[in-house]
């Protein structure tokens, strides 16, 4: 799993995010903390992960479909290798659910 360079800050961010979701303030918090480009990058990363997990499309085709760099696809692919299979199944299930809504 990815280890943040500053675990205390990362843990505080995660806890603040958890509270925001519990209070229905997640949109406001993420808008406050992330620039439009950063929000777009997160959305792109989610699409990359979903397509990589689907395993129906080669990485080069994902790159072309999403109009992104090979390095961006590779970073997503490398992170998949670090995560547990159970978690990746959870991600696959939930990315499929959000695509179908």
From Swiss-Prot:
Domain of life, per lineage: Bacteria
Primary subcellular site in the record, as a coarse category: cytoplasm
Any single Pfam family the record assigns to this protein: Trp_repressor
Compartments, as annotated in UniProt: Cytoplasm
One GO cellular component term noted in the UniProt record for this chain: cytoplasm
Keywords: Cytoplasm, DNA-binding, Repressor, Transcription, Transcription regulation
DNA-binding residues: 59-82
GO molecular-function term, one example from the UniProt record: sequence-specific DNA binding
Record GO biological process: negative regulation of DNA-templated transcription
Subunit text: Homodimer.
Function: This protein is an aporepressor. When complexed with L-tryptophan it binds the operator region of the trp operon and prevents the initiation of transcription.
Annotated family: Belongs to the TrpR family.
Name of the molecule in the record: Trp operon repressor homolog
Organism: Mannheimia succiniciproducens (strain KCTC 0769BP / MBEL55E)
């Amino acid at each position: 799993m990815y280890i943040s360079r500053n675990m205390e800050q990362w843990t505080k961010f995660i806890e603040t995010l958890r509270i925001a979701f519990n209070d229905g303030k997640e949109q406001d918090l993420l808008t406050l903390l992330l620039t439009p480009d950063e929000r777009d990058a997160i959305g792109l990363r989610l699409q990359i992960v979903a397509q990589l997990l689907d395993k129906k499309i080669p990485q080069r085709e994902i790159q072309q479909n999403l109009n992104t760099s090979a390095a961006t696809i590779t970073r997503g692919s490398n992170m998949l290798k670090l995560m547990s299979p159970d978690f990746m199944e959870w991600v696959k299930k939930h990315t499929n659910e959000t695509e179908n809504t």
